[in-house]
Amino acid sequence: MSKYAKIKKQAYEGNIQLPKLGLVLFTFGNVSVADHESGVFAIKPSGVAYDELSPEKMVVVDFEGNVIKGDLRPSSDTKTHAVLYRNCSKMGSIVHTHSTYATAWAQSLRDIPNYGTTHADHAIADIPCAPPMDDKMIEGNYEYETGFQIINCLKERHLSYEELEMILVGSHAPFAWGKSMEKAVYNAAVLEELARIAFITEQINPSVARMKASLVNKHFERKHGKSAYYGQ
């Protein structure tokens, strides 16, 4: 058995969940799973339909974006994943989609506001939208720079990637991550639902205000804080 078999299997399992969850059309997204000890990750091959995937088709890449094992070209977003893994040692899996509502917010260049407890259960802050990159970055190493768009946005907002596990890239689409593939896929699905709920909320009440901080903190802390009491 290949030493990369585990992460290839997990990456495959994560990728095939995306169409089942309604997060992708055709080949519009990718999941990767990292092995930080080995400095590699497995990712979906570029342009391959989800129903044609298999664990063997996952491409193993190092944290510099170099292919280590695989016969197919890795996702065109590979360098973005590589930058994130290289700078975020506790990030175990990354999901990138073009899910409808989250992408619409990204194209609108808007953060997703924290309007209610569903949002606060998963994020203590608005979901940030990183600003579009400048022309020099676009014309340079575009996918590489996308990774730094994400990292720099989190730094500028004083947000930890361990606490906020989702983001929008302006004029592009959402990214989500987690310590495990399961959590990263979960976060990608949650992000799409938060985007949908926020959109509907603004249609019902265009002047709606963000939820008050005390309620945000209560819901986030009861699920994620030191004294969390949600779940078993």
How should each PLM-predicted stretch be described?
Residues M1-Q232:
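Glycine-rich flexible loops
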